[in-house]
Amino acid sequence: MAPKQSKTAKRSKKQNGTREVRSEVFEDSIAKNQMANVPKMTEKSDTKKPTKLQVKKDNFKARLYGSQKKKERRYTEKELNIPTLNRAIVPGVKIKKGKKGKKFIGDHDLIALNRLIKTIGDKNDEITESKLEKTRRLEEIRDLKRQEMERKETEKKEQLEGKKDEIKKKASVARTIRRKTKRQELKQETLAAQSEPIKKKKSVSFA
């Protein structure tokens, strides 16, 4: 027969035994059914967790080339079109955007159009041609450029002459107006002098 256990031994055995804590939700059948219908509250994250293979590859690349983390680009106020402080924004006025100093060619400007056609593909050497053809083409381009320069000079001269004529006209108009006003003033003075009555001289008689 096995020896009888003492009371203290029994107590210690009970105390040292593992206690399992079970939630009331799992114990209670009604609560269990209610929890079954409740959707999961934790939302799925948009970013996927990288796989072990991907992590290995990234580590290998980092050891070879160093860490290649892209720096976040910082945009300037000009790029974001943020209005400058302490400046009144005029309603209804749109500020022009885009490149400044764009030069547009006229539809009937044949010299400039021909020059552009001849120079297409020069930068990347896309044209396949012999030396003789190239020299001819370059000569044509030079000639067209010279024609453009001459035309610009003539336009400038015409503009200058037009301005001169305009100034002369303005000066002549101003001169004629001045002369007219002077004549009118003189007329008015003469009329005023004529209209004034001639005062009789006082005569003194002696007895």
Swiss-Prot record:
Residues 41-61, 147-169 have a biased composition (Basic and acidic residues). It comes from the Eukaryota. One of its GO terms (molecular function) is mRNA binding. Keywords: Coiled coil, mRNA transport, Nucleus, Ribosome biogenesis, Transport. Required for efficient assembly and nuclear export of the 60S ribosomal subunit. Belongs to the LOC1 family. PANTHER family: 60S RIBOSOMAL SUBUNIT ASSEMBLY/EXPORT PROTEIN LOC1, 60S RIBOSOMAL SUBUNIT ASSEMBLY_EXPORT PROTEIN LOC1. Component of the 66S pre-ribosomal particle. This is 60S ribosomal subunit assembly/export protein LOC1. The gene is LOC1.
